[in-house]
C-alpha cells in the first residue's frame, strides 16, 4: 500500500510557496469556512484554492463545524468556495470531542447534496430561437 500525504491548509499556515509544496503532497484539504464563533470565510481560501488549482494539486475543501443551523452553514460553505471542479470534494470538520451530532451532520450533508445538484443543473442555461 502506498502512502498518501494530504496537508491541512488554512490561514494559520500563512502564505505557502505552492511551487515547492506541490511535489511534497498528494493533495490538500483547504479550509474554506467555519462557524466556531459565527460564520466566516478563511482569509486564505481564494489564494490557496487558486494556487492549488493552477498547479494541479488535488483539493478537498472543508467547513469547520459550528453549533448553528446546519442548512445555513452548508449554504455559506458552498457559496464561499465559488464552484467545484472535477475531482474536488467537500468535507465537514466536526471536532466536538466525542459529542458528534449525527442528525446535524446528516442535515448538513443532505443540504450540501441539494445545493450541488441545484448549482450543477441550474448553472447552465440555453436560449434558442
Regions found by a protein language model. Name each.
Residues 126-129:
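Acidic carboxylate-rich catalytic motifs and surrounding loops in phosphoryl-/glycosyl-chemistry enzymes
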Residues 2-123:
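Substrate-binding cleft of extracellular glycoside hydrolase catalytic domains
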